[in-house]
Each structure stands twice: as structure tokens, then as C-alpha cells.
Amino acid sequence: MIIKAPIKLIGNNGSPYTRKMVALLRYKHIPYKIIWGEPDEYLDRNNIEKPKPVLHPTFLFENSEKKITAVTDSTPIIRKLESKFMSRSTIPSNSVLRFLNYLLEDYGDEWGTKFMFHYRWHDDKDIDNAGTLLPLYANSTLTNEELSHKKEKIAQRQLGRVWVVGSNKKTAPLIDKCFKKIISILEDHFINFPFLLGSRPSSADFAFFGQLSQLVGFDPTPRSIIEKNSMRTMAWVGKTEDLSGLEPDSEDWISDSKLPETVKRIFCEVGKTYVPTMLKNEEAFNSGEEKWSAEILGREWEQRTFPYQVKCLKWIRDEFRSLVDKDQQKVLDLLKDTDCERILN
């Protein structure tokens, strides 16, 4: 795969992963061209083979034969970009911090999207808001008839996918509780640190930003929750949108000798919520079960088995196993009593 500037991608402002990647490109000073619209439609028009699945954003790279290849999945794309554009790195050079960043990025992408997707498609006012805005973000000149048709179509499609994130009547109170907890931790964290792992942004920051860009700037219900509980998080989202003027330094990362108290609390939240669901999902997948349940913070979490997150768990373990023994032990020491250690076996 040939990666060269300007980077071309297809996205939608209502997509957390589009916002994640565009903000990262801005920070890294990587020229880009974004096509606002539906990847499906663009790829069909241009006879480009579709990735599986087709997602926002879809990146367009050249292969060795100079044919355009459509690529999705933000985490590996970031690593490819970092290998080509090495300045202003979002990946810590310290191997211990690099793993911690990977784990937080995965949490932001995979658990954070449960908040976003749940709030967007749970209450009528949020459903109406998303059903209207998402088609208009792709094409603001739709006729009212076209908009009505696309609104109904997208709402039906997305409401049929809420099982992916585990959003249902049983889990709704727990999702709400977890969301309020993590933003309360972020409120405390941003008193002392401008970013998750110090004074410069990591790829984990952009993962958190992607989901929060929607929770703050798109969906009415979570925005009202953040306004009441964490104005620092709201301000952080506004700032992280464009960090092109930030001048990072190699000393801006936190130390790997001891985690700041608020960072440890974030990992405790990861360990209490994301970790048990990942382990149960893996167990169900390996047993051929279509659904599973787990106890999270004293409540039952129930959802259908999600094969992609089995891959996510494997990749986390691969990252951990790539560390030398002493760094593996340092990670385990830093994560002691967070319950995150459970996924590293």
C-alpha cells in the first residue's frame, strides 16, 4: 500500500471515527482531502472495490499496481500513517506508554462508541435529530422528499444495529451511569493534564475525541449531561478539534514509573466495564453462543456476540506480548488493582 499526501478519505461529520481521523491529520500536519458523503455511493460511482464492512471514514490509498484501494479501521490506519509521517507522533516512543495508549485507544473506540450509539438511537428526540442531520451532512441540498426517505432509511438501519453496542432497555441505566462516571474522571484529569497521557495528544486522545465530538456536538441528550457534569470535557473537545498549532515536545509524555491518580482511575473504569464485557464476548464467541450476559457494576449487561471485538482483544494481547519481559512486568505493575490485567493472559 502506497501512502502519500494529500490523504484522501470519505467521511461524515456525524461519524466519530471521521472526526477522530480528521483531527489527527490536522495535528500531524498531514495534507488531506475529505469527500463528504456516503462511501458506498462514491465507491460504486468510481468502480472501487468495497472494504468489508464499508464504514466512515473510508480511506483511499494506492496499491503496488497504482490502483485505488478502499481501507477502513482507524487504529491500523494510524500506525500506517505514523510509519510514513513520523513527526508530531501520536504514539509514545516509550514502549510501556505505547501499550497503555493502545489500550486506551481501544477503549475509546469500542466502549466509547457504546455511549455515542446508545444516546443517538435511544430517545425519540435524539433519533429524530440524527435521522435528519446525518443525510444533510452528506448532502445539504436534498429535497424534503429525499430527506424524508433517507431519514427513515438511516433510522431503520441504525436502530437495527443497536445490538452491536449492547444498547437495550436493560443496559440503558448502566450505559448512562458509566458515561457520567468517565466524564467525571475526565473533569478531574483535565485540571492537571491537557491530554490523557500528558501535555501532548496520543492516538488515544483522538479516539476519545471522536466519540466525544458527537456526545458534545451532535446528540442533544449527552450534550446536556456533559454541560451539567463536565465543562472541562466540553472545552477539551472544542480545543482538540484542531491542534495544528500545538508544538509538542518529547518530554511532554507522563512518566512510566507511576501513573497519575486520574489516569489510574481511567484504567480502573476500563477494568470494571470494558474488560469484563470483552472477556465474556470472547468466551461466548469461542463457545458458539449468539448472546451473552455479564455483571457490570452490580447490574446485568446483555448483548449479542460481536466477532470484531474478539479481534480487538487479540490485538491488545499481541501488543502486550510484543513487549520485552521487563516492560510487560512494568505494565502489570502500573495496572495493578485496575482489573485491566485480566485481559493480558
Task: Walk through the language-model features, giving the residues of each.
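Non-transmembrane alpha-helical segments in soluble domains
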Residues: 78, 82, 102-105, 183, ...
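GST-like domain detector, emphasizing the conserved glutathione-binding G-site
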Residues: 1-146, 196, 216-217, 269-345
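Short N-terminal edge-element motif at the start of the domain
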Residues: 162-196
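Alpha-helical packing segments of well-folded alpha/beta enzyme cores
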Residues: 17, 21, 175-182, 186-189, ...
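Divalent-metal (Mg2+/Mn2+/Ca2+)-assisted nucleotide/phosphate chemistry catalytic cores
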Residues: 122, 126-176
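Active-site/pore-lining binding-face segments in mid-to-C-terminal subdomains
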Residues: 209-299
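GST superfamily/GST-like fold recognition
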Residues: 196-216
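Inter-helical turn/loop segments and adjacent helix faces that build the functional surface
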Residues: 82-89, 165-170, 192-197, 219-225
